[in-house]
């Protein structure tokens, strides 16, 4: 039974990821005044299936000087972590209702750094290693602001459970009282998922393809799936934290429709940003975080700590 539950979550996520790649290519195509994929199937709808067949039937080549064990473990672990992060998300009911679901997601997203680091190191290539080092520095840096923003929101929520976020936001979205946090959170999720304009790890112009330069076929596809699963997961998390969907226990389907629509809109926003903005320089990326976001988030966190204490003496206004 547990296996069926797990598969009922994993398979739709992988399908969503497959068609997100198609959507991205279509959106970028139309933004650059061209068609995008339109040969395989009607309007190119079967392109993801063709891509999957092509990638998984290719020979998984390995460089002679690589560490074979780590080389294979890294992409497998990347996808495993990306899919495990979906388990505590309430949609409207989570697969695993944990007390510390928010901490669980933070811990797993920090573990994802290791997969990138191992893949860069195991490839035994200069480009891959530079890409991996950049990714590690970037991800660890932006984890800091993500953690502080989450802490501020949890102070308003009153618990670490994601399920209670829907109850907190019954009257007002948390986006409205904490919009500076939401703004910084969104930019940090872009950096966390290595998306443009923060895609320094895959800098085609200077690093060929970044940490996955030596990967081909199946293992490359696993990295690709992990990246896009993380993108959708981060957007889903943004919706849960800031734009809580209205949940009525009598009709839980409404929540799912509401939640999915918002997540898709945010994902489209990610693609729009990719088509519009140039890549940051590495020092600009670090300056943005350590000199702009970190002081601001710390101030906001102190404000959220002080607010309940300041207002504790006021009787409830009913």
UniProtKB/Swiss-Prot annotation:
Functional note: Core subunit of the mitochondrial membrane respiratory chain NADH dehydrogenase (Complex I) which catalyzes electron transfer from NADH through the respiratory chain, using ubiquinone as an electron acceptor. Essential for the catalytic activity and assembly of complex I.
Entry annotated with the keyword GTP-binding: no
Keywords: Electron transport, Membrane, Mitochondrion, Mitochondrion inner membrane, NAD, Respiratory chain, Translocase, Transmembrane, Transmembrane helix, Transport, Ubiquinone
Example of a GO MF term: NADH dehydrogenase (ubiquinone) activity
Location in the cell: Mitochondrion inner membrane
Top-level EC class: translocase
Cellular component GO terms, alphabetical: mitochondrial inner membrane
Native source species: Murina florium (Flores tube-nosed bat)
Domain of life the protein comes from: Eukaryota
EC number(s) stated in the UniProt entry for this protein: 7.1.1.2
Bilayer topology: Multi-pass membrane protein
Transmembrane feature ranges: 3-23, 69-89, 102-122, 144-164, 171-191, 222-242, 253-273, 294-314
Source taxonomy: Eukaryota, Metazoa, Chordata, Craniata, Vertebrata
InterPro entries recorded: NADH_UbQ_OxRdtase_su1/FPO, NADH_UbQ_OxRdtase_su1_CS
Protein name: NADH-ubiquinone oxidoreductase chain 1
Similarity remark: Belongs to the complex I subunit 1 family.
